[in-house]
Amino acid sequence: MASTRSIELEHFEERDKRPRPGSRRGAPSSSGGSSISGPKGNGLIPSPAHSAHCSFYRTRTLQALSSEKKAKKARFYRNGDRYFKGLVFAISNDRFRSFDALLIELTRSLSDNVNLPQGVRTIYTIDGSRKVTSLDELLEGESYVCASNEPFRKVDYTKNVNPNWSVNIKGGTTRTLAVASAKSEVKESKDFIKPKLVTVIRSGVKPRKAVRILLNKKTAHSFEQVLTDITEAIKLDSGVVKRLCTLDGKQVTCLQDFFGDDDVFIACGPEKYRYAQDDFVLDHSECRVLKSSYSRASAAKYSGSRSPGFSRRSKSPASVNGTPSSQLSTPKSTKSSSSSPTSPGSFRGLKQISAQGRSSSNVNGGPELDRCLSPEGVNGNRCSESFPLLEKYRIGKVIGDGNFAVVKECVDRYTGKEFALKIIDKAKCCGKEHLIENEVSILRRVKHPNIIMLVEEMETATDLFLVMELVKGGDLFDAITSSTKYTERDGSAMVYNLANALRYLHSLSIVHRDIKPENLLVCEYPDGTKSLKLGDFGLATVVEGPLYTVCGTPTYVAPEIIAETGYGLKVDVWAAGVITYILLCGFPPFRSENNLQEDLFDQILAGKLEFPAPYWDNITDSAKELISQMLQVNVEARCTAGEILSHPWVSDDASQENNMQAEVTGKLKQHFNNALPKQNSTTTGVSVIMNTALDKEGQIFCSKLCQDSSRPSREQTSPVPPSAQEAPPPLESPRPPGPPATSGCDLAGTWRRHRD
């Protein structure tokens, strides 16, 4: 009984025992009778607290006592950690006798080697406006930020969490804003989200953890939320997941990237991502584990749309078609070996597996990725040295596949500018490496606005990687046939661009030897202007003396090449003269009526130049004069590229403005109708890049009698059967004007003239 009294002393006080006036028991009444005064005298029942058996009474109500003993729930975040969802604590006077005790418990729960290594020493309000210094300042349902000695870092801590335990918080808080923003995100189109199983491998030293993730509309609400959940599941040593990369090295930047063709991702922390060789190695047993995972993942994709999705905050392991799978928001389930197979993942092994079930038309090029950009290399050999290239460029699908090279989409990660990645298989160049070496050495030297530029190169033991400028405007013929207006002045500007490129090359003693319309690409600039760019340097070489190799395309080959008397830089001027002639009338100056190459060569050697009516009636004499100077059989009398630029028809705008688009286009289609049409304007630029020096072997022949070997380069670059390659080549240019690349494009006044 004494112990009971001591416990209740804090809630009761001693009653004042002073007697009330006239309340003495048994006192005689004024009437002389014995009567009971006080409450009984008034007919009231005395309270037990005021009875003689209890000398104490309550000073606070039971409701107030219950409220004081009830624990207050509050959520605590780490200072500056935007990926941490917060930790809920129940705070009561029984559990924490002092504020320091709370700090000790928060340190034990929130501090580690990465986060708050000095422990929790300060608690801020969620907006950082003030510090909390006592337990009484902590309010029910509120959120707070824990820090060491550093100042408060302003972060939207409530962005990735919507506490459902807060029952007393009214509207107008930061949490309300977070919910409102979340609702606005839901309104955005999420049609690309389909049930999909992906594998996430954490970066770092081996053995590396790999977890399988199910993504659907219930588990993938936003990119930030998925990153947060991956952080919980993968548990990086360096802290939060800062970046996710595909096996190609492409960084995942939005939610939609998870639902592309990539199934495996590498989780990276704050450290700089390394494309080390060890990161790309898997042994056979690990490959088998991942291969089985992919087979199960494909089954999950098929049935995922019919099965109910997992809850984003599920607390129990989930399974797909009977196969245990780790859930992003369930860290406990990720620890089991069945739900998160732990294996030292590598890019090579994973890519081999993932490519087996993909078509070659996927965004990464399907099996072509294994051949060209995976560490396996083109021939299955390791070429992990190529991956620093991926740090700067994002590699896309295959856009061109030739006999010796593959061309892929290539985008600069920092500027967003598009390029073309040319990948040459060294195994196919065995014994002829000097040809490729010569071509690349020339590309390294040339830098001119009218020449397709080599941006960057990289070489491995098995492959040669060339980042090339990508020109999408079609070729020279496309510029004419796709326009609504084509004048003599436009032709003059085209010749200026070509002569400008030739003057630069010849100043370096470089001869191109394959000047033709399909190697002249139209570059379109943002301001609407255009210029020509010369490409395909497979036959180019440095002139150190007379050359005797008979090569080129028959329509544009110079007479000294056919005669085998030795030639030099001016063979390019002859080819430019043929192109100028075609630009103004639509047909070549030398042609065979019987379609015989020997007749064509005889006409070229004779050099008899005519300007037949009525096709040349409206062409200025200045243009005819320039063409005559360019098509001189006598090399000494032939003009140079510099003289072309200084000619009045080119430099002084002596050309006319009459529209001759219909006439020239009609003749082009009549005389250049024997090559395959391209699908779009980009195809032409890719074909030029795809050509290599090895593709030019068909354009090298010993004499004019060896007619079967001068197959045009355009047809050589496509995979044609050997029997087809031996067919006699056509006499006209191998590139006809295909379908218009664009419609309604007016060329008048839009051609650039780059001045050196």
UniProtKB/Swiss-Prot annotation:
It catalyses: L-seryl-[protein] + ATP = O-phospho-L-seryl-[protein] + ADP + H(+); L-threonyl-[protein] + ATP = O-phospho-L-threonyl-[protein] + ADP + H(+). ATP binds at residues 399-407, 422. Signal peptide: none annotated. Disruption phenotype: Frequent spontaneous seizures that originate in the hippocampus, with most animals dying in the first few months of life. The keyword ATP-binding applies. Residues 393-650 form the Protein kinase domain. One of its GO terms (biological process) is hippocampus development. Expressed in the central and peripheral nervous system including the brain, spinal cord, cranial and dorsal root ganglia and in the parasympathetic ganglia. Present in neurons, but not in glial cells, in most forebrain areas. Strong expression in the hippocampal CA1 pyramidal cell layer. Expressed in the photoreceptor sensory cilium complex and in eyes. Also detected in individual cells of the olfactory epithelium. Keywords: ATP-binding, Cytoplasm, Cytoskeleton, Kinase, Nucleotide-binding, Phosphoprotein, Repeat, Serine/threonine-protein kinase, Transferase. Residues 353-364 have a biased composition (Polar residues). Residues 1-44, 301-375, 707-756 are annotated as: Disordered. The modification Phosphothreonine is found at residues 61, 665. Disulfide bonds: none annotated. Its main location: cytoplasm. Residues 72-158, 196-279 form the Doublecortin domain. Belongs to the protein kinase superfamily. CAMK Ser/Thr protein kinase family. CaMK subfamily. The doublecortin domains are involved in the colocalization with microtubules. This is Serine/threonine-protein kinase DCLK2.
